[in-house]
A protein has these predicted regions:
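C-terminal beta-signal and adjacent terminal beta-strands/loops
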Residues: 22-24, 680-682, 701-765
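Outer-membrane beta-barrel translocator/receptor signature
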Residues: 78, 91-95, 104-183, 191-198, ...
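Gram-negative outer-membrane beta-barrel transporters
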Residues: 441-442, 559-561, 567-572, 590-685, ...
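Acidic/polar loop-and-plug regions of large Gram-negative outer-membrane beta-barrel proteins
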Residues: 175, 183, 188-190, 197-275, ...
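Repeated loop/turn-to-beta-strand initiation elements of outer-membrane beta-barrel proteins
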Residues: 126-127, 153-156, 193-198, 285-288, ...
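Acidic, small-polar-rich N-terminal luminal/periplasmic segments of exported/outer-membrane proteins
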Residues: 22-125, 524
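Outer-membrane beta-barrel proteins
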Residues: 133-141, 163-193, 210-212, 247-279, ...
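Structural signature of Gram-negative outer-membrane beta-barrels, strongest in the C-terminal barrel
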Residues: 347-351, 361-407, 411-572, 598, ...
Length: 765
């Protein structure tokens, strides 16, 4: 498993979710907010990204991002084809909302909330929308949609999205940290008497998400009290930690051939999609919808993961050199050397997704039955390469270095660490049912069930030797290679069939017009995804269970809307692979563990006087590891062990606060701010390192100039907080007892997004 990006925020429950910023009213398509969706989620205010929705992690490890477009997942799996490379919230959308956990579970089988987006499919007449966004670092983002009538009952919609983002610091390996382009063209035929419509759409995207690896890590001094200091003139968030050289040498996992590629080209994602949808409504309240999409794609996700950080100054055990522009070898005179693992994840993908629903409205209820047939075919490999680089205290660009005592060039240990391979199909065939029932004027019940057949068929490289033990990865590993014990690396066949199911039920009782009680329970049963079979060992194939329950009350009056809930969530058999480090050696440690979280959340919207609104949210949670034990033995005989059972889950705060005040100065001018507090988070699994609590801050002005033009200005991190977050590279084996030995030491990890001023304009015509 590769590292994941995490922005640790919160909302109402203890489960992961990604949410979109705003909700627009639908045009002629079948979008629209309903009681399937949550409201009040202003989360395109992303402290980690300038162009994507933030991830909200509450109590469970990150899993696939749940984003739907036109009723279907944007991508079946996010590694190697990430959502942000294929989807942006732009002028092409008529509606963007957030599905509830229960709705996501029943309709997709996934855990957590889901972004629910719908494409503009055209309206009668002519309509246009142009969105523009820039920031003081030079980002340029454009989105144009035009739609209207072609002929009687024929509509069209066309959209262009372009993003040119240089990031918050210059890098030498490419001019931009995000270059994404998305094109959509849709034709719609309206049925007579307003009964529905049939639509066909073509979607093409091309994306180079360089920021995934360009912003992955940076050096800082860990003081020892939860705070960090900058290392010399290296400024977190505005100084590059990528080497100058753009090219990477690797060994192909499939063929064993040595290849060279630029990081920019390695990160390229392409997608060509054909989408069909149909909606038809009868007079008796019966409605039929169907959506289908075929996607032919190349997905890619590149990591440049920091590993060991070594002090080499005046140490005769090391003889580091670099090669200058003239090809001459020079001695490296710096203090530190950072080793990095380059992971070039890529796969050719074909997806065929189909969902259909039949719903019937009765006087006091709505009954719905649905069907999914989702087929995912992939040929995937992750080619990994190790290299070393300088750590420049003067803030200059790093350069690659090599230890002349061990090798004569930069790259080494091809595919030894975390290389991956799998090929084949994953198929999910599911049926589901929901019933939303107003039993009385005061009592509402919502319940549903899903049953799913999941089938995996293909091959991977989890190879065993004659004794039945896993061979594991080794230097120059590839299909066809021979291990030290004589085992030939050949693909291993996979064939699994599982039955998954999900159950959900919710009750809301209105005691009076202002006060009521609410509770819900969702139970999800899953099995491993195809991507879990990518490492050198097979995952735990036992069922994964996720029970989620919450109960509380709500209160509403003219100036206050309040909800307070207690919640519980747990998850069994999380499959993960740790890359454990001892000295300069790295070993992969596959494992399966459980996790549970108790939580309490209070969410309030307060409107004390005209024009002013305050959204306030407080969450206390306690996410803990269960059955979290693993160990590996290194080549020198040292055994590295981890027993994190009972520890607080790394990178997840126990206290979270959100404060979002806004004031309408005039009916057309809005002033707003947003503050988010994250309490202390642990930076490694053993809870040895930690980062102190921090505030994220946003503020801005929105101005509706006239009915055609809207302008906005947003300041990200206006408190100008700097520092580290997330995890510390190479620290998994450090214990609480050892942590005191690492005070005021140089380390690497992720960091806060720097102060950024953004400007937006939206023109409707």
């Amino acid at each position: 498993m590769k590292p994941t990006r995490k922005a640790l925020l919160t909302c109402l429950l203890c489960t992961p979710m990604i949410v979109a910023a705003q909700t627009e009213e639908p045009a002629s398509d079948n979008a629209g907010k309903s009681n399937k969706e949550e409201g009040n989620r202003n989360v395109m205010l992303n402290a980690s990204s300038a162009n994507g929705p933030r991830e909200i992690q509450i109590g469970l490890p990150s899993t696939d991002v749940n984003v739907l477009e036109n009723g279907l997942p944007v991508t079946f799996a996010t590694n190697p084809h990430s959502v942000n490379s294929n989807w942006r919230m732009d002028a092409s959308h008529s509606h963007v909302g957030l599905l509830k956990i229960s709705e996501t579970a029943i309709t997709t089988g996934n855990i957590g909330y889901a972004v629910n987006s719908w494409t503009k499919l055209g309206e009668k007449g002519f309509h246009g929308s142009l969105n523009y966004k820039t920031n003081h670092f030079g980002m340029q983002e454009f989105s144009l949609n035009v739609n209207g009538s072609l002929a009687n009952n024929w509509l069209y919609s066309a959209n262009v999205y372009q993003d040119f983002d240089p990031g918050t610091f210059d890098i030498k390996s490419s001019k931009l940290q995000d270059r994404t382009q998305i094109y959509k063209l849709a034709l719609t035929r309206l049925y007579g008497n307003g009964r529905g419509q049939f639509s066909a759409m073509y979607h093409y995207s091309n994306s180079h998400p360089v920021s995934n690896y360009a912003t992955q890590s940076a050096p800082f001094i860990y003081v020892g009290d939860g705070s960090v200091k900058e290392y010399g003139k290296f400024k977190l968030g505005t100084t590059s930690y990528l080497p100058v050289d753009a090219n990477m040498t690797y060994r192909d996992m499939r063929t064993g051939e040595i290849g060279n590629i630029s990081l920019y080209d390695a990160a390229e994602n392409r997608s060509s999609q054909v989408y069909l949808s149909n909606k038809y409504a009868w007079d008796n309240g019966l409605t039929w919808t169907a959506s289908a999409r075929y996607d032919h794609a190349r997905g890619a996700f590149v990591y440049q993961t920091p590993m060991s950080l070594t002090y080499v100054k005046d140490n005769p055990a090391y003889n580091y050199k670099t090669i200058n522009a003239l090809g001459q070898r020079e001695n490296y005179t710096g203090d530190y050397v950072q080793s990095r693992m380059s992971c070039l994840n890529a796969g050719d993908i074909d997806e065929l997704l189909f969902t259909t629903e039949l719903s019937k409205k009765f006087s006091r209820s709505t009954l719905r039955v649905g069907f999914n047939e989702w087929l995912y075919n992939i040929d995937y490999a992750s080619n990994t390469t190790m290299y070393d680089q300088s750590v420049a205290a003067d803030g200059s660009y790093p350069v690659r270095v090599y230890d002349a005592n061990k090798r004569d060039y930069y790259f080494y240990d091809f595919n030894k660490n975390a290389s991956e391979y799998y090929k084949g199909t994953e198929n999910k065939l599911a049926a589901y049912l929901t019933h939303d029932w107003d039993i009385t004027d005061k009592l509402n019940a919502y319940y549903g069930a899903r049953i799913e057949w999941q089938r995996l068929n293909g091959e991977n490289a989890a190879v065993r030797n004659a004794a039945g033990d896993y061979v594991g990865r080794f230097s120059d590993y590839h299909l066809g290679a021979t291990a030290a014990d004589g085992t030939v690396i050949r693909p291993v066949d996979l064939n699994y069939n599982w039955v998954n199911y999900d159950l959900t039920a919710a009750l809301t009782y209105k005691i009076n017009r202002q006060f009521g009680l609410t509770g819900d329970f969702t139970y999800i049963v899953q099995h491993p995804r195809f991507e879990n079979f990518s490492p050198a060992t097979l995952p735990n194939t036992q069922k994964i269970t996720v029970p989620l329950g919450r109960a509380g009350f709500y209160y509403n009056n003219k100036w206050l809307s309040l909800t307070s809930l207690f919640s519980y969530i747990s998850k069994t058999n999380n499959n993960s692979t740790l890359n454990l480090q001892h000295g300069a050696e790295i070993m992969a440690a596959p494992m399966s563990y459980d996790i549970q979280t108790w939580g309490w959340t209070t969410d309030a919207i307060i409107r004390p006087f005209k024009g002013f609104e305050l959204h306030a949210l407080f969450t206390y949670q306690k996410p803990t590891y269960k059955k979290y034990e693993t160990s590996v033995t290194f080549s020198d005989g040292y055994t590295g062990s981890i027993n994190a059972t009972g520890n607080i889950v790394a990178e997840i705060p126990q206290v979270l606060i959100e404060l979002d005040p806004s004031y309408m100065i005039t009916p057309d001018l809005k002033l707003w701010t947003s503050f988010r507090y994250f309490s202390k988070t642990y930076a490694n699994i053993n809870d040895a390192y930690y980062f102190n609590g921090r505030w994220e801050s946003f503020g801005g002005v929105d101005w509706k100039v006239n009915k055609m033009l809207n302008l906005g200005c947003t300041v990200v991190n206006f408190l100008n907080q700097t520092g580290a977050k997330g995890s510390i590279a190479g620290a998994e084996l450090i214990t609480k007892e050892d942590a005191g030995n690492y005070s005021n030491c140089l380390m690497t990890g992720s960091y806060l997004r720097p102060l950024t001023v953004e400007f937006t304009a939206k023109l409707n015509f």
